[in-house]
Amino acid sequence: MRSSSKKIDPSVHVLVPKHEVLSVEEAFKVLKELGIGPEQLPWMRASDPMARTINAKPGDIVKITRKSPIVGELVVYRYVVSG
C-alpha cells in the first residue's frame, strides 16, 4: 500500500469552524479583556491539523469562530503549545 502525497485541507470541511492566528496586538487585547494569561486558555497542539493548516506556532493564540443555530456565532480561543 502506498501513501498518498496529497495534502488534505481540513478547513474546507463544512463541520470545521473558521480558525485564525491572532496578531500580537489582538492577542494582548483578548487576554487583557479576559483578565488571564495565555497559559490559562485551552490548549491546541501545534501538530493539530488546523494549526498546521494556518501555520500556528507554539505561543500563538488562535481564534475559532463557530456558527451555532442557538447562539448565532460563538468565538473561542486556543493557546498553541508544542507537540
UniProtKB/Swiss-Prot annotation:
GO MF terms, alphabetically ordered: DNA binding; DNA-directed RNA polymerase activity
One of the GO biological process terms: transcription by RNA polymerase II
Catalytic activity: RNA(n) + a ribonucleoside 5'-triphosphate = RNA(n+1) + diphosphate
Chief localization: cytoplasm
Disulfide links within the chain: none
Keyword Nucleotidyltransferase attached: yes
EC number: 2.7.7.6
Keyword annotations: Cytoplasm, DNA-directed RNA polymerase, Nucleotidyltransferase, Transcription, Transferase
Pfam families: RNA_pol_Rpb5_C (PF01191)
Cell compartment(s), UniProt: Cytoplasm
GO-annotated cellular components: cytoplasm; DNA-directed RNA polymerase complex
Family: Belongs to the archaeal Rpo5/eukaryotic RPB5 RNA polymerase subunit family.
Function: DNA-dependent RNA polymerase (RNAP) catalyzes the transcription of DNA into RNA using the four ribonucleoside triphosphates as substrates.
PANTHER family with a match to the protein in the record: DNA-DIRECTED RNA POLYMERASES I, II, AND III SUBUNIT RPABC1
HAMAP family named in the record: RNApol_Rpo5_RPB5
Quaternary structure and interacting proteins, as annotated: Part of the RNA polymerase complex.
The protein, known as: DNA-directed RNA polymerase subunit Rpo5
Protein's gene: rpo5
